[in-house]
């Protein structure tokens, strides 16, 4: 876990969103399998040796050092800086972390994620039928934010991790709108 979410589920005043740590590690060749708001998942195979495990630990310690030194994004996460140099120019690691943490707090992301699947999407037709309708041109393109009360012809599949949120033939309603949000 990274700082930001207290043990009782309340939000901390300051935080280090896991997405920043994940991006930092990615720039150093460490693969994070899953990133949540304040958690990271690493998978190790049975044949992993101490060198790889210690490499992960070393890079996590390097992140902590660079965070404490408050490096500029240009130096700490070069790939992120390259995506929008004018935005990240002069920005430092702690500023980025607190900015993202503030957005997570404002939008109550952990609570929203916790409740996202309390009510599952409604199955209106089998996936095969939804696919056939797409093949026959009987579907329309709809922006994702306008998907409520419409039957999906395709999966809504964020990647990573590549797990479908909504399957073809399912419909999101007001009860499960949090899936889209």
Language model region names:
Residues 1-181:
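Non-catalytic terminal extensions of PLP-dependent enzymes
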């Amino acid at each position: 876990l990274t700082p930001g979410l207290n043990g009782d589920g309340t939000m901390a005043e300051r935080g280090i969103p896991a997405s920043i740590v994940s991006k930092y590690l990615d720039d150093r060749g460490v693969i994070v399998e899953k990133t949540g708001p304040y958690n990271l998942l690493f998978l190790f195979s049975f044949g992993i040796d101490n060198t790889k495990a210690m490499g992960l630990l070393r890079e996590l310690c390097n992140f902590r050092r660079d965070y404490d030194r408050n490096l500029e994004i240009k130096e700490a996460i070069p790939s992120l800086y390259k995506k929008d140099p004018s935005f990240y120019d002069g920005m430092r690691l702690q500023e980025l972390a607190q900015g993202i943490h503030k957005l997570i707090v404002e939008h109550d992301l952990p609570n929203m994620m916790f409740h996202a699947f309390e009510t599952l999407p409604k199955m209106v037709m089998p996936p095969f039928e939804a696919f056939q309708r797409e093949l026959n041109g009987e579907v329309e393109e709809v922006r994702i934010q306008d998907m409520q009360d419409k039957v999906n012809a395709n999966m809504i599949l964020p990647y990573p991790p590549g797990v479908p949120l909504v399957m073809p033939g399912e419909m999101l309603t007001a009860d499960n709108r949090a899936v889209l949000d």
